[in-house]
Structures are given as structure tokens and as C-alpha cells.
Amino acid sequence: VYVGENPYKGTYKRNHEGDYHATNYEIRGMIRDQNPEGNDNQIIEYYMMDDIDKETLRKYRQIFEIRNEGHVWNSLDDKSFLEKLGGYRKDRRTGVEGLTLAGLLMFGTGQAIRERFDNIFMDYRNESQVTSDIRWNDRITYDGTWENNLFNFFTKVTPKLTEDLKKPFKLEGGIQRIDDTPVHKAVREGFVNMIIHADYLMDAGVLKVIKKSDEFEFTNPGILK
């Protein structure tokens, strides 16, 4: 609900408890979300191919080639491949070109991402079977040993989330064993949704994944779109 002439003073939102005055970052988020093309496609000016972590992109392309054997994109150079994915773009009207928000976050070097998104942090903690004097028994956060982009965060954390899940013996067609259960898929989907629906342009936020003995917690900045 919007009342008056100043959106920062007259905007209200409603939750299960009633109406409340929207915060400035919620209002800025609503204004950004008016973009019909979405924010992922936004060109991050002055961020170019040098800001892409080559090893991250190589790993992604390797997975892409395995899953899409014979695809015409497999023969493209890295820049052209990113353009096809929407990770690099040129605005034909202004001539401005560069990595998109999605391209930088997904494949960028940790330094480039931290320079542009110093408000966003990635954190995984295994809090299952902890005691009163131990806060966690495993953690992944930025420590200088890995390029903290979204692709690396996803590929490093996903195996840790699913390694303890039960895998009942089941054969597909009586021949091939199926190790991927509905629970495995649900956990991955929750992780992916956390990444997709995060608002990376907020003032501050943490992509937080917590593994507990009986549940998984996925927390991100922003709301479902």
C-alpha cells in the first residue's frame, strides 16, 4: 500500500500480524524489482572478463559439456559462452558492455565480488550433534583458500548437505542403482532456491546454510519473487 507523495514515508506492507511501515531497503528492493528484465541481467559496468575466475568457469563448462554432449556452445570461447548464458552482455543502445550481475556472482573472482558486493557473505555450518562447548563441527566461509563465487559455494556445500542422507538400495529397470532420492532432490532444491531468490543488492545479507541433526536451514537476504 502506498500513501502520499514520498514512497519512503508512505509505503506499507502487510504480514500475518497486520500492516507495518516498509523499511528503506524493502522500498528500494520494490523499486528495483520493477525492472521487467530482472536484476540478474544488469550490466555491472567496468567488470570485464578479467574479473572471471578461469578455474571456476572451466569446471562449469566441463559439467555443461558432459551433460550437453555435442552442444554448439561447447566450441565457443569463454566470453561468447558467457554471453549465451547471460553472464556477459552489451547494451546496443549505450554501447556499455561487461559482466552481468549474475555472471559476476556466479563465476567471478572472490576479490571482484567482494569489491562490488561487500555486503554479501556466504556461510555454511554443520551444527549436527554439537555439544554446549562446540558451536559447529564443520564450516565453509571465506577464508582465502577458495574463490567465493556462487558456483564454488554451491559445489563445495552440496556434498556436505547430502553425505549423511540415507540411500536405500533401489534399481532402475532392475539394472542401474538409483542413489538420488526425493530427499536429496529436496535439499538441493532448497539450496538452489536460496541462491535464486536472494536480493544481492540489499544493504547487507548472508547466504547462510545450517545443517542440523533433524533439519536444514536456508537463509538469504530478500524475499521470494
Describe the function of each predicted region.
Residues 1-8:
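Elongated alpha-helical scaffolds
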Residues 9-202, 209-225:
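Active-site helix-to-loop segments that bind/position phosphate- or nucleotide-bearing substrates
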